[in-house]
Swiss-Prot record:
EC number: 4.1.1.37
Family affiliation: Belongs to the uroporphyrinogen decarboxylase family.
GO cellular component, one term: cytosol
Single GO MF descriptor: uroporphyrinogen decarboxylase activity
Organism: Mycobacterium tuberculosis (strain ATCC 25618 / H37Rv)
Catalytic activities: uroporphyrinogen III + 4 H(+) = coproporphyrinogen III + 4 CO2
Residues annotated as site: Transition state stabilizer: 79
One GO process term, biological-process aspect: heme biosynthetic process
Pathway: Porphyrin-containing compound metabolism; protoporphyrin-IX biosynthesis; coproporphyrinogen-III from 5-aminolevulinate: step 4/4
Compartments where located: Cytoplasm
Protein name: Uroporphyrinogen decarboxylase
Amino acid sequence: MSTRRDLPQSPYLAAVTGRKPSRVPVWFMRQAGRSLPEYRALRERYSMLAACFEPDVACEITLQPIRRYDVDAAILFSDIVVPLRAAGVDLDIVADVGPVIADPVRTAADVAAMKPLDPQAIQPVLVAASLLVAELGDVPLIGFAGAPFTLASYLVEGGPSRHHAHVKAMMLAEPASWHALMAKLTDLTIAFLVGQIDAGVDAIQVFDSWAGALSPIDYRQYVLPHSARVFAALGEHGVPMTHFGVGTAELLGAMSEAVTAGERPGRGAVVGVDWRTPLTDAAARVVPGTALQGNLDPAVVLAGWPAVERAARAVVDDGRRAVDAGAAGHIFNLGHGVLPESDPAVLADLVSLVHSL
């Protein structure tokens, strides 16, 4: 049973559920990570996967940016491939490479051999979420998972990929195997996120990091039904839900259809927008009543304060126009994760600026 808190004053929860926030809410994807010296010091003692599966460490890393910045939400420290590891997939996260899968999944037999999520294997992640709920006070906690397509991409390609050739070939040449794989990954994603919801997270975000590699036709045929099933299942639990991908301008409408498949009135459905698409354009593409999140270019943070201030003001103004055009709300974020070279002091000033506008 969920232990979610009642946080009526949260600007983040107000914006994602279509209510007027007291200020423009802001948080950053990868706000906990390599841009923080305290994170780098901790990671000298723990590998990425070890940190994800050690509750005290995951809790500490999640809290580090909350102590530094006046952000309006925390996001649980974990990794997209954690549920794959919890389903018995032999993988590692290699520095400067990313997730590497020992035995890629490329045949019907490979798909049939896949195991479901082991509930006991994700207990450390859920313990971390429970610890954070107790620590965060009035700051909401966002849980997250990778979307089925992005998990499939890692599994089929064997790691990060520029062209996603193997995954597209499987999708087009072996559609039965593809949909069987996606069905298993959808079940896994639902189980992982429901566990986080039951542990007390206040919202969830589903990252489809590689969806931008697909055409709108292929996305609708091979991905949308599975992503929609994730959100439909989560919608029964009454938490706000965000769907985010990179390079997805032409997919925003379909992605909003997925996230609103599980939306209940007043619960909140959000689509994340990267820096390539103006928020006002995104508002015209998504299902009416969907909130938007984004979308400062992460590289702008490296460009010096005058450039940061100009760009941030432009994003806030664009967000207000998007709301006027029908978006349910706007949450300020970067259009992707914080870059490792980012100066924490600049991010702190950016939060203060956004809150002042």
